[in-house]
Amino acid sequence: MKLNVNPTRMELTKLKKRLTTATRGHKLLKDKQDELMRRFIGMIKKNNELRKDVEKELEGSFKDFLMASAVMSPEFLEEAVAYPKESISVDVKKQNIMSVNVPVFDFKRKLEGDKGSIFPYGFANTSAELDGAIEKLYGILPKLLELAKVEKACQLMADEIEKTRRRVNALEYMTIPQLEETIKFIQMKLDENERSTVTRLMKIKSMMEEKQSNMV
């Protein structure tokens, strides 16, 4: 559907400039969409690998906790993990990837106490299974934070891909065709007007020549 504009040469010039800009914008957005998709696929692959690793390690830790709960009384188990020996602070920054602000987690871990042990208990009344569970959880934290970062990045990039896709489609299937159709229409009208003008001038010339001929 063409735009509702006056079929003038000035309007034609404006529309041609708009078409050039729209075509250039479409190419840039399409390139951005392709690059976003390439990075998104890489992020999804990384996310799946991280998730598998995290789930596997969490499963191992939970199994050790179950084994520990089987050989320890609930009171001793609860007391053993009631006072964590580690404090964690997380600083959230942002990294710009193709106009997408992806979160970056910078976390600092500090063990309490002089010995710097990760275990919040003595070993007299605890089991080796509980030690293993605590050790696994301690080691899995960096992967958990990385997984949170990657999953959030995937979500944000998916949103940006969808927004870019809508803009690409709007240009490709609406704006550019409208401009092309309108330019074609105006050009046709201008050509018609030019032909009419030429025909009228030729007719006037013929009439003037005929008048001069009759006067001789």
From Swiss-Prot:
Alphabetically ordered keywords of this record: ATP synthesis, Hydrogen ion transport, Ion transport, Transport
The keyword Ion transport belongs to this UniProt entry's keyword annotation: yes
Gene Ontology biological-process annotations: proton motive force-driven plasma membrane ATP synthesis
Top-rank lineage group of the source organism: Bacteria
Short name of any one Pfam family annotated for the protein: ATP-synt_D
Purpose of the protein: Produces ATP from ADP in the presence of a proton gradient across the membrane.
Stored NCBIfam families: PRK00373.1-2 (NF001543), V_ATPase_subD (TIGR00309)
Listed name of the protein: V-type ATP synthase subunit D
Gene designation: atpD
